[in-house]
């Protein structure tokens, strides 16, 4: 079985019940999530051999965090244990015209304070086919940027396919710093995942004719973004998600895959959102699964978008649908009727 390694931070998520605001909350629901961990869970859920690499404290909350991955079948044996802090983030779910809000409390988390010598990449990459990371990981600290670069170099040396979701987070670093660091890291990447905001924020590449707030998405603009990214870094594939925001609850959702020659667009879904956190990660998980299982370009983008569409109907960061459910939606069964 093909093995995948995902590298990054896993955090505890605290959210008011339902659509409650932070200012109303007297209790919080506890779950766990993080961009790369969410991808690992998706892949394990599809029956793939997926491992997550990070540094997580040994205390009880850290163990609960690790157990959340084990429950979903993710290999946690490569996680470094130690440090004092587990990152925390708070999510207030939006409704109608009120947007969702996220507050991070992740400074000095164990993974951000990790040292290069704590990760033996020769051992971690033993028998591995695919390595996935996101732009969040090198943004956590200078050490993490150096560790991510070391991992990419070792993966490339071993012939491992490398994917990266640009995932720009302005609360972690500036556009200038992100552009400098990511430009070096992306030299090693085979598959780039992004949206139009990431491409603009990190590399100054803009999708002409697109205004996501107005729901205006230009296919030609997205094609140009993908081509510029591929030409600049030599990516074999560029996948770009297309989200049209109608309200906090209702979005149009689609994506495009560029293979260096042709652009393939998925069908468009109008989603009534239950929880959009992890939606992009479930797209990445679906993309990796499809590519590793020999799907053609059109099948790949349809599977990835359908997986992400379904995730956004599920509470929490983790996608919890089967391959058959994704294939059914990708094949046109979008009625939502009761299955008996």
What spans do the regions from the language model cover?
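Catalytic-core regions built around general acid/base machinery
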Residues: 146-158, 181-188
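Conserved post-catalytic alpha-helical subdomain immediately downstream of the catalytic base
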Residues: 264-333
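A short helix->loop->beta-strand "cap" motif at the edges of active sites that frequently abuts
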Residues: 156-161, 233-236
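Conserved N-terminal subdomain of the carbohydrate kinase-like
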Residues: 49-136, 326-340
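Glycine-rich phosphate/adenosyl-contacting loop at the front of the ribokinase-like
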Residues: 1-74, 95-97, 114-117, 265, ...
